[in-house]
Amino acid sequence: MSPFGSKKNRSLSVRVSTFDSELEFKLEPRASGQDLFDLVCRTIGLRESWYFGLQYVDTRSNVSWLKMEKRVRDQRVELHASNNVYVFSFYAKFFPENVSEELIQEITQHLFFLQVKQSILSMDIYCRPEASVLLASYAVHVQYGPYDYETYKDGMLAGGELLPKGVTDQYQMTPEMWEERIKTWYMDHEPMTRDEVEMEYLKIAQDLDMYGVNYFPITNKNKTKLWLGVTSVGLNIYDERDKLTPKTTFQWNEIRHVSFDDKKFTIRLVDAKVSNFIFYSQDLHINKMILDLCKGNHDLYMRRRKPDTMEIQQMKAQAKEEKQRRQIERKKFIREKKLREKAEHERYELEKSMEHLQNEMRMANDALRRSEETKELYFEKSRVNEEQMQLTECKANHFKTEMDRLRERQMKIEREKHDLEKKIRDADFYVHQLTVENDKREAETEKLRKELICAKMAEREATARLLEFLNSGRKSSTDSLLTASSVSHAANTASSMAAISTPSLITSSSTNDLETAGGAELTTHSSHYLVQGDNSSGISDDFEPKEFILTDNEMEQITNEMERNHLDYLRNSKQVQSQLQTLRSEIAPHKIEENQSNLDILSEAQIKAGENKYSTLKKLKSGSTKARVAFFEEL
């Protein structure tokens, strides 16, 4: 009876999420995990189903893998109360040892690409900054196709999540700076199909230390906290603080049996002389997951070392035919693209040549137009210059006439000045004579004054004597005589003083008149020079003109090319490593040391020591199984 019932009231609602789609199914209540898994694989067209599984969160909030042999409803799958739907995630449960040799279908590669990319971006898988940029360029190639300078726009990559947050946080770089470095790698990629680009992405990602490793916390007999890493080639033991470099490893061909009892996990090795490898987990649920992953990885490990089954051979043949067909189509596409690019280049050159000729013609027309404008400008300037010359000549004649007039006036002023100077000299001489005469008269006046004083004194004496004489009896006649003599002497003295004062007044008046006349003449003279200064400006003209100016052999070639792919990859890997080293050096100055995580520090130590994932595993496998078990127990 089919597991997919038709009764809606009894069916189970299931939603399965992949990285690029969501699927919804109705299952019969008795449907097993295998029924649901097969339905999902058929829906998405997946045949390499052994790598994948259905993951869910159980009723205890633990992440678990759906068991294929048990019914879905019996596996403690949490039922969403809002819509009664069982929710699962379709993830890769096991990883191949070599993606380029083992992954056959394009859909398988695509699912691995999406999951690994998401694990790197979410930092579940540690990736160095320079490798993150390279992987981001491949992710851009998958999303947008080969680089096309015509369609690419600056800022086109800013919207998507391309780099892990841990990478962007530890460097002081803007999104534009990161985009420029991703774009540089993107431009260097050869034109490839989407599946080829995804394969290149996975080839680089599988070299990362944490790729394909499922980590579980464990302890040894000394109760030392460690990490158990379940991988496609065996079991790795890691230090609690270092998930990158394993302390020791055991390959699946060295392990005979795996079992657990409660929290104790026992691994029996192929070498009977070596004691069992024992560790302890935190709870029973982790032990069940470890056992499930160990069984699945061990089966795939042994399967890879056996001849391919008919189904796988058929799948590989179909994939090879499909790849050859795509190679033929790609060759044809590349040839057509080159022809189209050549035609476009020729058309571009013709358009460029035509545009160049048009520019030259436009420039010639512009030059001709400017020449005509210049010619007109020169004519106009010539006319203006002639007018200015005429105006200048008129002004020169006017200035000449004015200068003659001023020269005559200057001569007249000189004559007046000469006459005035003569008058001033005469006046000075006259004043000098008057001064001398005045001094003489002042001396005479002083002399007369003294004589007057002496006369007054003599008069007093005479009066005294007269009074004495009058006492003798001739009083009346003597008084008359004395009075007449005094009046006559006073009149003579007043007349002499008036004669002396008059010349002094005349001299003062004459001097004032001369000074007034001289001042008027000097003022006129000064005004004359001011006028002459105001009208002595000239006219200059410094204006200057400015200048303006697939056949039968294709299948064989494709087959040989496919055989050389691996060798080409090894050759290209050296070039990629060199480019990664260059990028690491470029971004090193922008590093913020305090933002580095523990994994960043451990990775830097790996680089300095010259170690990588494969060299470390090779060293660990060089020791004997017994020595590795003893080393684990002593940790």
UniProtKB/Swiss-Prot annotation:
This is Moesin/ezrin/radixin homolog 2. Coiled coil: none annotated. PANTHER family: MERLIN/MOESIN/EZRIN/RADIXIN. Keywords: Cell junction, Cell membrane, Cell projection, Cytoplasm, Cytoskeleton, Endocytosis, Membrane, Transcription, Transcription regulation. Pfam families: ERM_C, ERM_helical, FERM_C, FERM_M, FERM_N. It is found in: Cell junction, Adherens junction; Cell membrane; Cytoplasm, Cytoskeleton; Apical cell membrane. Disulfide bonds: none annotated. The lineage of its organism: Eukaryota, Metazoa, Ecdysozoa, Arthropoda, Hexapoda. Interacts with Moe and arm at the adherens junction. Forms a complex with Kibra and Ex. Interacts (via FERM domain) with Sav (via FBM motif). Interacts with Schip1. It comes from the Eukaryota. GO terms for molecular function: actin binding; identical protein binding; integrin binding; protein-membrane adaptor activity. One of its GO terms (biological process) is positive regulation of protein localization to early endosome. Regulator of the Hippo/SWH (Sav/Wts/Hpo) signaling pathway, a signaling pathway that plays a pivotal role in organ size control and tumor suppression by restricting proliferation and promoting apoptosis. The core of this pathway is composed of a kinase cascade wherein Hippo (Hpo), in complex with its regulatory protein Salvador (Sav), phosphorylates and activates Warts (Wts) in complex with its regulatory protein Mats, which in turn phosphorylates and inactivates the Yorkie (Yki) oncoprotein. Mer acts synergistically along with Ex and Kibra to regulate the Hippo signaling pathway. It is a peripheral membrane protein. Residues 12-305 form the FERM domain. Transmembrane segments: none annotated. GO terms for cellular component: adherens junction; apical part of cell; apical plasma membrane; apicomedial cortex; cell cortex; cytoplasm; cytoplasmic side of apical plasma membrane; cytoskeleton. Its main location: other. InterPro entries: Band_41_domain, ERM, ERM_C_dom, ERM_FERM_C, ERM_helical, Ez/rad/moesin-like, FERM/acyl-CoA-bd_prot_sf, FERM_2. Expressed predominantly in the germline. Expressed in the developing oocyte from stage 6 to the end of oogenesis and in the apical ends of follical cells from stage 10. Ubiquitous expression throughout embryogenesis with enhanced expression in mesoderm of early embryos and midgut of late embryos. In embryonic CNS, expression is seen in neuropil and developing brain and is enhanced in neuronal cell bodies. In embryonic PNS, expression is seen within the cell body. In third instar larvae, expression is uniform in the eye imaginal disk and is enhanced at the morphogenetic furrow. It comes from Drosophila melanogaster.
